[in-house]
Amino acid sequence: MANQYRVTVDELIQTLSAWDGLITGRKKIHLIACGGTALTLLGYKASTADVDFLVPDKNEYARLVTFLKEAGYEQINRHRWKRPGEILLFDLFEGDAVFTTHLLASPLEPGRNRKIREFKKIYLGVLNSIDLIITKLFRGNAVDMDDCKLLVENEPINFDELKARYKETAEYETSQDKVLRNLEVFLQRIQK
């Protein structure tokens, strides 16, 4: 049975605030929201089915994983973490890849993420709109297409930049024809 629970911004912020009080070390851990989590944090969706974070820095990722294990979370698969008895699911992506899509630049570079909130030990941002659209269109399911349309309707998108970055990102994809077709379908759908 699919997970019917949905996470709101308030619930996510409460969880991250609790984590912030327990994480050891002085340096911040950068959590860059992607997927439906980003759209929820931006206020375009009321909730998300699970929490998707990109953790670009490998040392920060290692610190986060150590914390999660100490806090009782279990790794369900390569990316997914869950604490027994809780419903909240976290998908954590290390480095510059969201699912199987490798970004052309680190989301920690200027302009590659938007700050949502900064705690003492956690920086919470969302992936920039163009990279968010690219990662969603590479998956290409109906929900992802709808999410991209939502971004186009609410964010200033430079379509020349989107097309160029999308095509360059597609060069590194094993199913290049499929993802390029996803872009064509999407652009026809929004008529840009």
Can you say where each PLM-predicted feature lies in the sequence?
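Compositionally biased terminal segments of proteins
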Residues: M1-K192
